[in-house]
Amino acid sequence: AVLTEDGVLGLAPSIRERYQRFPFDIEPVTGMPICDMAPGLKSWNYIEASIALAAVNAFFNRPDRMPDKAEIYPGGRRSRNVFTKFWESHTKDRRTLFSEPMYERDELRNIPGMIDILRRDEDRTYRDYLYTAYRELLPSCDQLTVSGKSFVSKLAGPMLRYAAELEKKTLLWGMDIPLCPSLMDRGIDHITGFIADDAEECFRLVKRGAVRDDILRFGHFVSIEKQ
């Protein structure tokens, strides 16, 4: 997580590796400008890329940057149910390929429609597909949904380019997704991200290693649709 001087929080996933294969290109330090941290998202050092994504989210995911037609969901404990309500109203009749969701397979069992899940080998269960299967799966799906974790792991780029070739609907969904309207100009159809209402408390929970649903209680989701 990254907390700005004016009290805005940006979240990002944590990807653990057995050993660090790549050094830091941009060493993050307290007080560093966001514009200096953001290029680290391109790094193959997953820690560096994760911190950079959190910095990007701290820049975009704030109430004063939301477009007028953004859909704002209820916060607090109700944030935990936003994904289910969104899926029921937007995608229940579609087959979806979901890359590295922040939800476990069992949490999606009551979600309408068909969802195929892609994960890196380190995170995969026997019911998930290995990430390299996207070329076989995506042609038979109606849409591709990508999490922030896939931007850190570098899976998002190839998948989104392939989805564009196939003219599939593309969605970015998760508490680690930047609410950046200009992404719509790059072919993204829908974005749902998270805004922390109590940034200090969210930051404290992240440092403590709290579970996802505890953090969600102190913020709300926002959706942006391509017009």
Language-model segments: residues:
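Structural motif
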Residues: L97, Q143-S147, L171
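Electropositive, gly/pro-rich neighborhoods at or near active sites that engage anionic ligands
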Residues: A1-M102, K226-Q227
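A short, aliphatic-rich alpha-helical micro-motif
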Residues: L138-P139
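C-terminal functional extensions of proteins
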Residues: K168-Q227
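NAD(P)-binding Rossmann-fold cofactor-contacting core
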Residues: G113-T125
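Short beta-strand/loop segments at the ligand-binding rim of alpha/beta enzyme cores
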Residues: P112-D116, Y162-L172
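Conserved acidic residues
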Residues: R94, D142-Q143, D189
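A short acidic, amphipathic alpha-helical/loop segment
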Residues: E107-N110, L155-Y162, S182
